[in-house]
Amino acid sequence: MNWEMVIGLEVHIQLSTKSKLFSTSATKYGQHQNTQAAFLDLGLPGTLPVVNKEAIRKAVIFGLAVDAKISKDSFFARKNYFYPDLSKGYQISQSTNPIVQEGRLEIETSKGLKTIRIERAHLEEDAGKSVHGYIAGETGLDYNRAGTPLLEIVTYPDFRSAEEVVAYLKKLHQLVKHLGICDGNMQEGSFRCDVNLSIRPQGQAKFGTRAELKNINSFRFIDKAIEYEYARQVSVLESGGEVVQETRLYDADANETRSMRAKEDAFDYRYFPDPDLLPLVITDEYIESIKKQMPLKSEEREAVYREHLAEQEVEFLLSNLEIADYYDKVAVVIGYKPAYNWITVDLISTLNRAEKEFSSDVVPAEILLEIIANVQKDIISQANAKKVIAEYIDAPSAIEAIIEKLGLKQVSDEGMIRELVQGIIAANPQQAADFKAGKTKLMSFFVGQAMKASKGKANPKQVNQIVQEELNK
């Protein structure tokens, strides 16, 4: 029998806010345990939630980016279940009428373009974290993560292969980073995916019983987990068994999924409106104000890049949002290709030598443009621009002052350069004779000698021109 794979996804993205969804605690990753947990996050009595306005804004941005409906009235609900890292005994989430509804995202597969329907995206708070092994024989609880704002993005069961799932997740990952609503760090849990997978005989309309796969933190592992679970379910059904509705964990080391617990249905959580939170009212004026501030859609940006850059260059920029934003600021002044070369060849290579990560704050785009302007005005050479960048990275100061300090100002005095070139030709009569006899490659020898004699300060364009004039006399 031929079996068809049917998959729906639930992706949790941590929104990039400075404070939590309902408390003022910070959301910085990697801090000492329980140092970023307010009374509300710990579930202490007498505390009340206050909605983080920035989380609302970021949810609306996402909804607009996927052409979804933004709910004018949405509600927060209590999702009730018991787990040690859920201090209140319930999670504040959204059930009916979530903030984002009915969106779509187009993906590219080996069979062509496919539209994936997004059923909903709702706001909810993250849970804390159980810590094993910190205290011998005990499990600790760290509530730093509790209350961190999440946007859970739920698709319809539109996927029919692992390839489609990975293509969607990569596109979504790129989108949320591009929008600036999530840093997309999968290792730190900022972008997490649950896979709901079932199988059915080819051509059957009715869905099979699904299993939910958790604990998948890379695109490669998602592909492997899906293929394993598909094969497992086929084996179960073909041997006469029944697939159980359950949650399964993926073990990357063993490349297998293992049963974790029975999978709950919505009614098991006993959702009811949170009495401490008013309905969330979003006006048309608010939505319009956000539309005006939104960046180009990633598809629009990609189309512009592909007009001017090679495939590899486009992929590099699209996978590095901060660099792409920086690039856009430089490209609008000096052009697409020159901007790419300056950023990758001059700036990033200099940062690498200084053992520094790229950040738009280290050498702001305005500073790089000032350095480029000095090259264009023949004040410094292209080669010496890297020295200026390196000095700025080490000790930021005015670019003019750095050029003076390093003595990099080019000599553009024609008389001085001509005298220098004439002296070099006179000192190398054999090479000059060979040049006149047809060995034109010796031109670079004389240019190199002139640049060396001037300690790199002579204007290279003028040196080239004057060497040619003097040798052809």
Curated annotation (Swiss-Prot):
Sample GO molecular function, one term: asparaginyl-tRNA synthase (glutamine-hydrolyzing) activity
Catalytic activity: L-glutamyl-tRNA(Gln) + L-glutamine + ATP + H2O = L-glutaminyl-tRNA(Gln) + L-glutamate + ADP + phosphate + H(+); L-aspartyl-tRNA(Asn) + L-glutamine + ATP + H2O = L-asparaginyl-tRNA(Asn) + L-glutamate + ADP + phosphate + 2 H(+)
SUPFAM superfamilies hit by this protein: GatB/YqeY motif (SSF89095), Glutamine synthetase/guanido kinase (SSF55931)
Entry keyword set: ATP-binding, Ligase, Nucleotide-binding, Protein biosynthesis
Keyword Ligase listed: yes
Domain of life: Bacteria
Gene3D superfamilies in the record: 1.10.10.410
Swiss-Prot/TrEMBL GO biological process terms: glutaminyl-tRNAGln biosynthesis via transamidation; translation
EC number: 6.3.5.-
Top-rank EC class of the record's enzyme: ligase
Entry keyword Transcription regulation: no
Record note on quaternary structure: Heterotrimer of A, B and C subunits.
Known role: Allows the formation of correctly charged Asn-tRNA(Asn) or Gln-tRNA(Gln) through the transamidation of misacylated Asp-tRNA(Asn) or Glu-tRNA(Gln) in organisms which lack either or both of asparaginyl-tRNA or glutaminyl-tRNA synthetases. The reaction takes place in the presence of glutamine and ATP through an activated phospho-Asp-tRNA(Asn) or phospho-Glu-tRNA(Gln).
PANTHER family named in the record: GLUTAMYL-TRNA GLN AMIDOTRANSFERASE SUBUNIT B MITOCHONDRIAL AND PROKARYOTIC PET112-RELATED, GLUTAMYL-TRNA(GLN) AMIDOTRANSFERASE SUBUNIT B, MITOCHONDRIAL
Family: Belongs to the GatB/GatE family. GatB subfamily.
NCBIfam families for this protein: gatB, PRK05477.1-2, PRK05477.1-4
Name of this chain's protein: Aspartyl/glutamyl-tRNA(Asn/Gln) amidotransferase subunit B
Gene source species: Francisella tularensis subsp. holarctica (strain LVS)
Lineage, opening ranks: Bacteria, Pseudomonadati, Pseudomonadota, Gammaproteobacteria, Thiotrichales
